[in-house]
Amino acid sequence: MASKRLPGPGGWTGRLVNVLIGLLLMGIAASVSVAATEPAAEDAAIAQSLAEMLRDARAIISNNQAKINDPEIGDKGLTAKVVLDQAMGTYKKNTGVDPATIDPNSRHGRLLRAMMAAIAEVMDANQSTINAKGIGFKAFIPAVFGRLVGESFARLANGEAELKVTAPPELVRNRKARPDAFEEKIIKTKLVEASWPRGQPYSEMTDAKGRAAYRVMVPEYYAASCLTCHGGPKGEMDITGYPKEGASENDLGGVISITLYRAPQAQ
């Protein structure tokens, strides 16, 4: 199976693929013939787009933890529309592309809209939890949000794609987030290695569940704010009731794993 690091920012190859990705994200790729566009470059762009939207929405949940867990406040104002509007704004700021302008009839547009619908679905389903008055910690944390969005996305994508937020096995707290054999292999042999360029995704054309698939794994690293639950002292219980991992800032803390299934004619 062909495998590779997704191109980094340096070198002419990286610049060329970044141009292709930029064209796709801006919708200009529609003017490029399908035959002239590498399927892998298109899949890489779609995967990065999905990961970006998830991260942007999850950051809102992270930044509002104090409000969510405030027992004195009822309505937190974190409706599906508020969260999605903010996430779309951040996406546009980070990519230079308004997600609403991406052709909904394209594969990219379908999957990005499935991701946005999944975000809205999760927020709608958890309003009673978020807005519960008289309750402090509500367990609606970024990790839970990411898992729920991934589950909703897989259903809404209707067999075209899947997304899961996973991590090195020793860091996984929820069995639903455990890496599969492929993910565990790439984490252990690639992403945790000191030689792996920080933040660089890994991609591979392989088989998944008996189907041809392009798989992308986007590494994520602990920020200072993550260490409240995942830092030290190791073994001490955090607010969620799990023992802290003793991690340090910039350690590999998770991976956004995206599977894009190939139609038979695209193989």
Regions found by a protein language model. Give the residues of each.
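Intrinsic disorder/low-complexity signature
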Residues: 15-18, 40
